[in-house]
């Protein structure tokens, strides 16, 4: 399994213990970009939420960097994996800088207080995508 960074084996996903999709087998190598394509209601988000432990697996296994996902703590997983789903997060009173800073939360303590180093990393990330000038703007006021 070591050739895959993320791999599923006979994965079954669904709700309340009932499999809606089963026999899901795939592997993703480090650096690959993968998209799930299908009609509305086909289970794309359910698969993603199951892989990221937002939903309980109905069956099968997920391996992350050759380790079963069930053996990885939520804190460790959140520092190694990020997922963008279609649901909008509630961003009232948040600036663009605040949104970028949420990517640092897995590295903070329980209160989520950013250190000077965290702030430096957030600033570097915004500079990398030329977004410094919108850092203090209301996130809801910028265009998608």
PLM features: what roles do these ranges have?
Residues 52:
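Helix-to-loop junction immediately C-terminal to a conserved catalytic motif
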Residues 6, 21-23, 135:
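Conserved structural motif at the start of ABC-family nucleotide-binding domains
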Residues 101, 116-135:
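Conserved ABC ATPase "signature" region
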Residues 18-19, 75:
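Short coil-to-beta microelement around the adenine-binding A-loop and adjacent beta1/P-loop entry
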Residues 37-39:
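The feature captures the beta-strand-to-loop junction immediately N-terminal to the Walker
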Residues 112-114, 138-144:
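Conserved ABC ATPase signature
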Residues 60-68, 77:
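Conserved ABC transporter NBD signature motif
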């Amino acid at each position: 399994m070591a050739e895959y960074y993320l791999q599923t084996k006979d994965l079954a996903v669904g709700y309340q213990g009932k499999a809606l999709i089963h026999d899901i087998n795939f592997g993703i190598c480090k650096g690959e970009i993968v998209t799930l394509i299908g009609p509305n209601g086909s289970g794309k988000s359910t698969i993603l939420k199951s892989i990221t432990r937002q939903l309980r697996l109905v069956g099968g296994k997920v391996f992350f960097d050759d380790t079963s996902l069930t053996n990885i703590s939520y804190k460790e997983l959140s520092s190694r994996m990020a997922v963008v789903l279609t649901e909008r997060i509630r961003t009232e009173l948040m600036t663009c800088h605040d949104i970028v800073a949420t990517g640092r939360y897995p590295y903070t303590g329980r209160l989520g207080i950013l250190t000077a180093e965290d702030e430096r990393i957030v600033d570097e990330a915004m500079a990398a995508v030329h977004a410094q000038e919108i850092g203090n703007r209301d996130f809801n006021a910028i265009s998608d």
